[in-house]
C-alpha cells in the first residue's frame, strides 16, 4: 500500500483536484429558496421590479411578439423560397414543436414563478450553472437578433411604402458597404437603427407604459387581420394549389421551412421572463403560453392560405408580401390599410423581442455570470435600465449591418437549443427524489405557500395532536378544521388539486395524513388520459401495468432511480442527434432503400424507444404543481426530437455563426462568470469563515465542530444566552499562518475537562466571542 502511495504523481493528483473543483463549479445549482426569499424583495441595487402584469397582458405580449414578424415577413419568405403553399404545413409543424416546448416552459414557469430570466433561471435551479449560462447566452442572442430583425423589417416596409425611395437615397447619399450581410449592394440601414433606438427608449421607460403601448398596437393588428381575411376572400384562386403546385419544393422544403417558421412562434418565452412582474404567475404563465400559441397558429395558417391563393408562390414579394399581394390584384387602397397593420404588428413584435432581453441580462448579471453593473434597476422606471440601453444599442447596430434572412435563420438555432434543454430539464426534475424541503410548498409562489402552510398547520393542531395524559383514545380523529378553512380559499382547487381531494378529504377519518389504502387509483383518479385508457382496455389495465413494470402510486424516486433517468436522458439526447443527422444527411440512402440504412434507422428507433420505456418505468416525484406537463416522458422526449431535427435543417453558415457566438460566451463565462458568480462568492466566504473560526465544547475544549452564531452588532457577551455552563462552548479565532496545534485527547476524562473549564471561567480567562 505504501508503495502505491509513493508511486502517485503529485502533478496528477493536482490535476485531479483541479478538475474536481471545476466540475463542482459548472454543475452547482442555485437554491430555489434563494429565489423565493427574493420574491417581492428589493434587488441588490435597492429597487424591485413592479408586479403589474395581468393574464391578458401576458397573452398580449406573447401574441404581439410572435404575430408581427411571423405574419408580415416570415409567411412570404418561406412560401417563396422554401415551401410554396406548403408553408401552411410548415407553420403547423413548427406550431407542434412550439406547443410541446410550451407545455414544458409552462411547468417550469409554475415551479419558479417569481423570476426573471426564463429558461436561464429554470436551468440554473435544476441542471447547473454552466448549462444555465449557455442557455441564457443563447436567449440573449435570440432576443438580440429578434429586435434587429424587427427593426430591419419595419425599415423594409417603410421603404416599400415609399416605392423604394429610401433605399435609393441611402445608396446615393451614404454609399454601399459590401460584405456586411445585406447583399452585393448593401447599405447601412440608418432607418432601422433609428427605429431600434426609439423602441429601446419606450421599453426603458417602464413595464406598464410599454405593455399599454403593446396592447393598443395588438388591437390595431387584430382589426387589420380581419380586413385581410374578408378582402382576400374575394380574390382567391384555387388554381394556385393545383396538382404539383402545393409542394413545389417537396417535403424537404416543407421541413426546412418549418425550421424557419419556428422563428414565428418563439415569442411565447417572453411570458416566462415576466414571472417577477406578473400578479399571479402560477396561473397566468401556463394559460398565457397556451393561448398565445393557439392564437398565433390561427393567424399564420389563415394568412398563408389567403396569400398563396391570391398570387402564385414564385411571385410573392419577400419584403412586404401582404401589401404587395393586394397590389398584384389591383386593390391599391388595401395596401395602405395593410400598411397600418404592418406598422402595428412589426412594432409590437420588435417590442416583444426587446422586452425580455434586458430581463435575461438583468438575471444573469444579478447572479454574477455577467458584469454586475448590468443588473442596475432604475428607481424611477423600476426597469433594468442599463441592460435596456446596452442591449438596445447592440440590436440597433446589428440591424444596421445584417440582412433580414440571415437574422431570422440565426435566431432560430439558439431558440431551438434553449427549448430542447428546457424539455431535458423537465424530464430530469420530474424523476428526481424529494429534497429535504417539501417540494410542493417549495416551488409555489409566496401567497400560495402561506395558504398551503396555513391549511396544514390548522389541521395538524386538531388531527395530528397527541392524546393528552389521562385521556382515552376514542378512535380515529375527525376533521373539524377543513370544513371551516378549505371552502374559504379561492385558490384551493389550484393549490391542492383535484387529485389530492381523496388524500386531504374533509370527510376522511384521517384528514391531513396520506391515504395509504387507495393505491394507484387515487393517484390517477383525475388523469383523463389514464381514465380513457382504462375504459379502452378494461380490467387488463392493472395487469398490463404490472407486466410492463410500471411504478405504482406508493413508489417513490430514489437517488438510484434519479441517476438512471439522468443517464437515460443524456443517452437519449445523443441518440436523437445522431438519428436526426442521419435522417437529414443520409436521406438519399434511405430513399434508395439501402439495407444498411434501413437497418440503422430501425436500430436507432428501437434504442430511442427503449430509453423512453426505461424512463417510463421509473417512479415520478409525487409532488403536485398547479400545472404539470402531461404524458411524461413522451411529450418532453418528442419535443426534444422535433427541436433537434429542426436545428439540423438550418444552413451551415448559421451553425458557424452560432459557434462563434458560443465561443465568445465561453470566454466570458470561464474568464469572468465562473469566478464572480454569487454562488462562488458565497462558497469563498464560507470557506474563509470555516478556516478562521473554530468551535470548542466546554466538555471537550479541543474538539472541532461546525456551526455557531455570531453576536449581533452592539450585543453584549452577557446576552449570548447565559453563562458558559448553559452555553457549553466558546469560540477562539485561528490565524491562517498559525494553525491550531492543540489536539483532542480521548484519554482525558470528561470530568477533567469540566474542571479545567470551571477554572478558566473563575479566572475570567474564557473568551466567548471572536477577537
Swiss-Prot record:
Region (Disordered): 712-771
Keyword Membrane: yes
Keyword Transmembrane helix: yes
Compartmental location: Lysosome membrane
One Gene Ontology term, aspect cellular component: nucleoplasm
Transmembrane segments: 58-78, 83-103, 130-150, 187-207, 216-236, 251-271, 291-311, 336-356, 360-380, 384-404, 407-427, 565-585, 596-616, 628-648, 655-675
Function: Imports 4-aminobutanoate (GABA) into lysosomes. May act as a GABA sensor that regulates mTORC2-dependent INS signaling and gluconeogenesis. The transport mechanism and substrate selectivity remain to be elucidated.
Ranges of compositional bias, category Basic residues: 745-754
Source organism phylogeny: Eukaryota, Metazoa, Chordata, Craniata, Vertebrata
Membrane topology category: Multi-pass membrane protein
MF terms in GO: amino acid transmembrane transporter activity; gamma-aminobutyric acid transmembrane transporter activity
Keywords for the protein's UniProt record, in alphabetical order: Amino-acid transport, Glycoprotein, Lysosome, Membrane, Phosphoprotein, Transmembrane, Transmembrane helix, Transport
InterPro entries assigned: AA/rel_permease1, CAT_C
Reactions catalysed: 4-aminobutanoate(in) = 4-aminobutanoate(out)
Annotated protein name in UniProt: Solute carrier family 7 member 14
Family to which the UniProt record says this protein belongs: Belongs to the amino acid-polyamine-organocation (APC) superfamily. Cationic amino acid transporter (CAT) (TC 2.A.3.3) family.
Species for this entry: Bos taurus (Bovine)
Biased segments, Polar residues type: 732-743
Amino acid at each position: 500500500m505504501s508503495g502505491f502511495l509513493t508511486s502517485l504523481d503529485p502533478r496528477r493528483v493536482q490535476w485531479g483536484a483541479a478538475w474536481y473543483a471545476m466540475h463542482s463549479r459548472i454543475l452547482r445549482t442555485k437554491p430555489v429558496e434563494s429565489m423565493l426569499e427574493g420574491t417581492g424583495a428589493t434587488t441588490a441595487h435597492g429597487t424591485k421590479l413592479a408586479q403589474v402584469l395581468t393574464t391578458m397582458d401576458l397573452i398580449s405580449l406573447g401574441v404581439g411578439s410572435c404575430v408581427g414578424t411571423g405574419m408580415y415577413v416570415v409567411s412570404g419568405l418561406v412560401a417563396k423560397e422554401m415551401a410554396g403553399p406548403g408553408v401552411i404545413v410548415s407553420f403547423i409543424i413548427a406550431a407542434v414543436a412550439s406547443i410541446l416546448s410550451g407545455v414544458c416552459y409552462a411547468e417550469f414557469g409554475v415551479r419558479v414563478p417569481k423570476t426573471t430570466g426564463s429558461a436561464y433561471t429554470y436551468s440554473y435551479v435544476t441542471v447547473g450553472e454552466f448549462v444555465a449560462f449557455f442557455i441564457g447566452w443563447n436567449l440573449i442572442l435570440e432576443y438580440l437578433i429578434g429586435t434587429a430583425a424587427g427593426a430591419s423589417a419595419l425599415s423594409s416596409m417603410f421603404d416599400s411604402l415609399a416605392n423604394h425611395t429610401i433605399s435609393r437615397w441611402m445608396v446615393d447619399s451614404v454609399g454601399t458597404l459590401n460584405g456586411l450581410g445585406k447583399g452585393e449592394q448593401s447599405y447601412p440601414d440608418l432607418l432601422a437603427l433609428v427605429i431600434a433606438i426609439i423602441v429601446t427608449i419606450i421599453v426603458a421607460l417602464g413595464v406598464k407604459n410599454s405593455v399599454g403601448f403593446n396592447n393598443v398596437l395588438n388591437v390595431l393588428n387584430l382589426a387589420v387581420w380581419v380586413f385581410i381575411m374578408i378582402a382576400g376572400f374575394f380574390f382567391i384562386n384555387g388554381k394556385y394549389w393545383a396538382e404539383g403546385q402545393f409542394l413545389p419544393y417537396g417535403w424537404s422544403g416543407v421541413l426546412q421551412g418549418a425550421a424557419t417558421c419556428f422563428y414565428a412562434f418563439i415569442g411565447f418565452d417572453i411570458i416566462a421572463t415576466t414571472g417577477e412582474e406578473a400578479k399571479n404567475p402560477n396561473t397566468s404563465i401556463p394559460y398565457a403560453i397556451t393561448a398565445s400559441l393557439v392564437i398565433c397558429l390561427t393567424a399564420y395558417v389563415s394568412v398563408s392560405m389567403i396569400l398563396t391563393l391570391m398570387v402564385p408562390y414564385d411571385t410573392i414579394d419577400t419584403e412586404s408580401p401582404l401589401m404587395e399581394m393586394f397590389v398584384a390584384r389591383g386593390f391599391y387602397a388595401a395596401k395602405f390599410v395593410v400598411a397600418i397593420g404592418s406598422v402595428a404588428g412589426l412594432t409590437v413584435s420588435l417590442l416583444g423581442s426587446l422586452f425580455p432581453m434586458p430581463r435575461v441580462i438583468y438575471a444573469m448579471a444579478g447572479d454574477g455570470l455577467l458584469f454586475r453593473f448590468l443588473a442596475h434597476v432604475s428607481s424611477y422606471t423600476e426597469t433594468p435600465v442599463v441592460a435596456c440601453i446596452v442591449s438596445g444599442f447592440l440590436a440597433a447596430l446589428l440591424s444596421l449591418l445584417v440582412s433580414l434572412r440571415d437574422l431570422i435563420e440565426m435566431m432560430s438555432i439558439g431558440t431551438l437549443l434553449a427549448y430542447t434543454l428546457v424539455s431535458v430539464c423537465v424530464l430530469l426534475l420530474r424523476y428526481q427524489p424529494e429534497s429535504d424541503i417539501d417540494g410542493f410548498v417549495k416551488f409555489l409562489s409566496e401567497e400560495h405557500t402561506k395558504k398551503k402552510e396555513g391549511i396544514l398547520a390548522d389541521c395538524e393542531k386538531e388531527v395530528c395532536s397527541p392524546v393528552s395524559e389521562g385521556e382515552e383514545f376514542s378512535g380515529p380523529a375527525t376533521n373539524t378544521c377543513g370544513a371551516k378553512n378549505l371552502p374559504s380559499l379561492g385558490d384551493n382547487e389550484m393549490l391542492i388539486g383535484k387529485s389530492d381531494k381523496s388524500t386531504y378529504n374533509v370527510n376522511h377519518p384521517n384528514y391531513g395524513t396520506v391515504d395509504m389504502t387507495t393505491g394507484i387509483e387515487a393517484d390517477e383518479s383525475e388523469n383523463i388520459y389514464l381514465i380513457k385508457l382504462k375504459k379502452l382496455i378494461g380490467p387488463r389495465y392493472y395487469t398490463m401495468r404490472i407486466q410492463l413494470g410500471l411504478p405504482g402510486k406508493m413508489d417513490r424516486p430514489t437517488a438510484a432511480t434519479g441517476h438512471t433517468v439522468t443517464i437515460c436522458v443524456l443517452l437519449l439526447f445523443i441518440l436523437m442527434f445522431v438519428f436526426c443527422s442521419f435522417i437529414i444527411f443520409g436521406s438519399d440512402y434511405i430513399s434508395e432503400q439501402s439495407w444498411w440504412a434501413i437497418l440503422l434507422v430501425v436500430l436507432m428507433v428501437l434504442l430511442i424507444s427503449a430509453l423512453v420505456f426505461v424512463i417510463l418505468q421509473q417512479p415520478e416525484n409525487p409532488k403536485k404543481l398547479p400545472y404539470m406537463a402531461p404524458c411524461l416522458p413522451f411529450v418532453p422526449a418528442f419535443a426534444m426530437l422535433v427541436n433537434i431535427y429542426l436545428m439540423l435543417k438550418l444552413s451551415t453558415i448559421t451553425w458557424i455563426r452560432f459557434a462563434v457566438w458560443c465561443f465568445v460566451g465561453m470566454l466570458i463565462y470561464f474568464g469572468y462568470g465562473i469566478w464572480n458568480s454569487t454562488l462562488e462568492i458565497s462558497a469563498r466566504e464560507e470557506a474563509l469563515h470555516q478556516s478562521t473560526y473554530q468551535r470548542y465544547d466546554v466538555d471537550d475544549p479541543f474538539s472541532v465542530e461546525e456551526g455557531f452564531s455570531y453576536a449581533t452588532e452592539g450585543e453584549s457577551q452577557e446576552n449570548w444566552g447565559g453563562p458558559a455552563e448553559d452555553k457549553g462552548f466558546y469560540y477562539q479565532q485561528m490565524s491562517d499562518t498559525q494553525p491550531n496545534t492543540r489536539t483532542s485527547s480521548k484519554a482525558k476524562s470528561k470530568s477533567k475537562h469540566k474542571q479545567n473549564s470551571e477554572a478558566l471561567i473563575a479566572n475570567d480567562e474564557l473568551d466567548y466571542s471572536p477577537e
